[in-house]
Amino acid sequence: MDKDLWAKMHGATVHFPIALVLFSFTLDGAGYAFSKLAMRRGLHSAGYWSMLLGAAGTVPAVVSGLVMTKGVLLGHDTLRVHHLFAWPTFALIVGIAIWRALGRGSTNERPSLGYVVAVGIAAVLVSATGYWGGEMVVGR
Amino acid sequence: MAVSAIASAAALGSAYGLSVDLRHRASQPSHQQATPEDWFERSTPRSPALVAQGRKAFLNSCAHCHGVDASGDEGPDLHELEGSDRYISRTILHGVKGEMPSFAKKLGSDDIVKLTAYLRSLK
């Protein structure tokens, strides 16, 4: 087996939650901000599915990261910073996705302002997590 | 909202449980099987002085991967190693491909003897 398999898996899988959460925030944010827009419902529907898929994508990202580091939860230096962002981000994304999935109304209903703010926070946290992950790969 | 919080806690709990399991597995001895060369070979001397010197060498060269008490960290637990003294010496000298670097340039034959004596003392 390739000794770098799990590092490669982690590198591949992390991009799904990063992209999908950012995408979800952009879509739901645009739909919330432009409430008179004709395609508002389409934006919220896409935001809904992006968030759910992004949350599903966190699982392989987290599992591959844990296997790669042999179970290290925090670590040292840059890895520690990466993990300090990663764990709250993971918890928040899963919680938000469940919140949206169990919410009343159809998938293209306008979500609450609190929800949009929470997704915005998740988008910032996932970006920071990705930044510090990248620092370990290409940083000096 | 409560369900979301429970889901978040469950996700973190699962990650923690996986972490504990992975760290436990990482601390197990290596899967490599040693040959029973000790049937044919003289054992490395194991005086207390040699073991103490080996401990020093271990802390300098090995503890950052195998833990200060040799019970494993990034590298496996070194207590009650299987295989002969020669197997241990060769592993230190040549490393394990993809897992452990070679120490041929860093350690001399005396250091290897001391390290082997120390590792053999670990029960």
State the predicted function of each range.
Chain A
Residues 1-140:
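Polytopic transmembrane helical bundles with strong interfacial aromatic enrichment
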